[in-house]
Amino acid sequence: MLNLKFGLIVTPTDNEQRRGDPESQENWVLPDFPLLNYEALWFADSFVMPTTGESAVNPHVRDIVNAIVRHAQPSNIGLGILPPFTKNIRSGVEQLLSELQQQVTDKPTAIALAAQVSPESAQIAGIHDYGLLSVGATTPAGFGALPSHWEIYARKAKENGRKAQRDKWALVAPMHLAETREQAMHQVLAGIDQYGPLYAEMGITPSRLSKEALIETLIENHFAVVGTPDDAIEQINRLLAQTGGFGKLLLPANHWANARDTLQSYALFSRTVIAHFKSTGSSSQ
């Protein structure tokens, strides 16, 4: 039996939207985070630099990690490291943690390598005993790659004398919830268009769609949930069936909707979706 945990994750795309905006820098996370049943806060970026001697911490990382620390217990803080990875990945991660320990209140306690479709992240994570962060879990190609990623991760762990643990596998799934799908779709009209070029570049949607068509496409291809708690539960069950079980479900802290509607979506997810899975439990073979 695997106890599924839930959390939020900030990615480079979302962080870029916040730079230079002191109000959003301060308020992107939940002010009452510990009260809403979320059990993890993650930040994903390209931390490890390609050459030795350079800082492993990008200039903006310290402030974001400090913000995370203010809203979560240290045991719940995670870092997802995005490709490209260097040959000396382990020394790079150790350098990163050492620098963060000097610069922030508490250093993160969970490290995972981010994977989209390529098997590289699963291979390296399995070899070095890092977690696996499936940032592209709901893209068409990323969803299809989930079973092979776990097989590679588990095989590499076994080859290095360990048994892979599913609770070290986190999936990212974009969601915005409201009481009705119509309300949710109306709310994300506020900011969804700024993500359109990125989604087109990733091959998730065609380019130059209207905001309404963009939202409908994201829903139809299962990349995102823009709807009700029942839609969110259906998506999570779909991911559980595809993977055989994983440890964490992370919601991107994006700017689709305004701050009030975003916080209400987080709260609704907590009251309904998290409560559903905590009451029913989730299992993994």
Residue map of PLM features:
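Hydrophobic faces of well-ordered beta-strands that scaffold small-molecule active sites
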Residues: 6-10, 41-43, 77-79, 109-115, ...
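Active-site mouth loops of central-metabolism enzymes
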Residues: 10-24, 81-89, 108-117, 221-229
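N-terminal beta1-alpha1-beta2 module of alpha/beta enzyme domains
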Residues: 1-71
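Short, acidic/polar
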Residues: 20-33, 92-93, 115-123, 232-239
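Conserved, mostly hydrophobic/aromatic
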Residues: 45, 68, 125, 153, ...
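Glycine-rich, proline-tolerant flexible connector loops at the mouths of alpha/beta enzymes
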Residues: 40-64, 83-87, 137-142, 250-261
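Internal, glycine-rich beta/alpha segment that forms the wall or movable "lid"
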Residues: 1-4, 79, 85-133, 144-147, ...
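An alpha-helical appendage that flanks or caps ligand/catalytic pockets
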Residues: 2, 94, 98-103, 142-246, ...
